[in-house]
Curated annotation (Swiss-Prot):
Gene designation per UniProt: groES
SMART domains: Cpn10
Family statement: Belongs to the GroES chaperonin family.
Keyword Ribosomal protein: no
Function summary: Together with the chaperonin GroEL, plays an essential role in assisting protein folding. The GroEL-GroES system forms a nano-cage that allows encapsulation of the non-native substrate proteins and provides a physical environment optimized to promote and accelerate protein folding. GroES binds to the apical surface of the GroEL ring, thereby capping the opening of the GroEL channel.
GO cellular component: cytoplasm
Short name of one Pfam family: Cpn10
GO molecular function: ATP binding; metal ion binding; protein folding chaperone; protein-folding chaperone binding; unfolded protein binding
Designated name of the protein: Co-chaperonin GroES
Keyword Cytoplasm: yes
Length: 97
């Protein structure tokens, strides 16, 4: 299935971090925190400004990002995997290699 976000929305696939404690113990269940890193799968056309102009998004498909998972972040199933739909303002940083 193909999904196309609207306006300033971004579709992200979470990149799961290995859940280990500082001592090397593998954490499971509620002890393991969800990763706030992901890969951008799709982006909208841009943010609509007050004057009607459209400002292109700073992120692009394939970018690795760090995001804030808070109010307004929606989880959906896409082809059997969980993806996140969020506003570009919920993205805190682009991870550059």
């Amino acid at each position: 299935m193909k999904i196309r976000p609207l306006h300033d929305r971004v579709i992200i696939k979470r990149i799961e971090a290995e859940a280990k404690s500082a001592g090397g113990i593998v954490l499971t269940g509620t002890a393991a925190q969800k990763s706030t890193r992901g890969e951008v799968l799709a982006v909208g056309t841009g943010r609509i400004l007050d004057n009607g102009d459209v400002k292109a998004l700073a992120v692009k498909v394939g970018d690795k990002v760090i995001f804030n998972e808070g109010y307004g972040v929606k989880t959906e199933k896409l082809d059997g995997q969980d993806v996140l739909i969020l506003s570009e303002t919920d993205i805190l940083a682009i991870v550059e290699a």
